[in-house]
Amino acid sequence: MFTDAIVRGLDGDDPSTPSANANQPNDTVHTIAVFGHRPPELGGYGENSTTMSVRRRLIELLRAKLEMHPDLQVITGLGLGVELLAAEAAAAAAVPYVVVLAFEGMEQRWPEATQRRFSELLAGARSVITANAEVPKTSSQFARAMGRRDDTIMTYTTEAVLVRHADDRTLGDLQRKLERNLEEDVWVMNPE
C-alpha cells in the first residue's frame, strides 16, 4: 500500500527540491486543483463522449497554463469522475500531478478495472498525501474525511478548475468555498 509522499513518478523529480515535495507548502509552484462531478453526472462509469470531451478540454487548458507557468502542477483527490480525468489529463499534457487521498484504501469498493486505473495514476503521481489516517465507518465520517481532503487540497492550490453543470446543486458549496479562498482564480467548466 502506498503511503504519504513516497510515490514519485516523473523522471527528473528530485524529492529534495521544493517543487517535487507537495508535503511542504511552496509558493514557487503554480498548483491547479481540479474538482468536479462523479460518473453519473458525466454520462456513466464508462468512457463516453462527455468524459472524452472533459479530458480533452482539461489537456488543452493545462497545456496553455504550462506555457504561462513552467512550474505548473495539478493537485487532485483521484476520486471517481473528474478527479481521475484530471490526473489523466495532467499525464497527457506532461504536467506533474499530486494526489491527496481522503484515506488509504478509498478505491477498494470500486470495480477491478477502475482500481487498476487508480493504481496506475497513483503510481504516476509526483507525490501522494493522505488527509485522514483512519478509514471512515459511517456516511457522516466519510463526508468529514472528504471535506478534510478538500481542505488539504486547497492549502496547496493557486487556482482551481471546477467541472460542473450550472444547474447542479451538489457542487455549489464547493464552488463558493473555492471562490472565497481563490477569488477570481476559479474556472468553472461545463462538462457538456
Protein language model annotation of sequence segments:
Residues 4-192:
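Acidic/glycine-enriched connector segments
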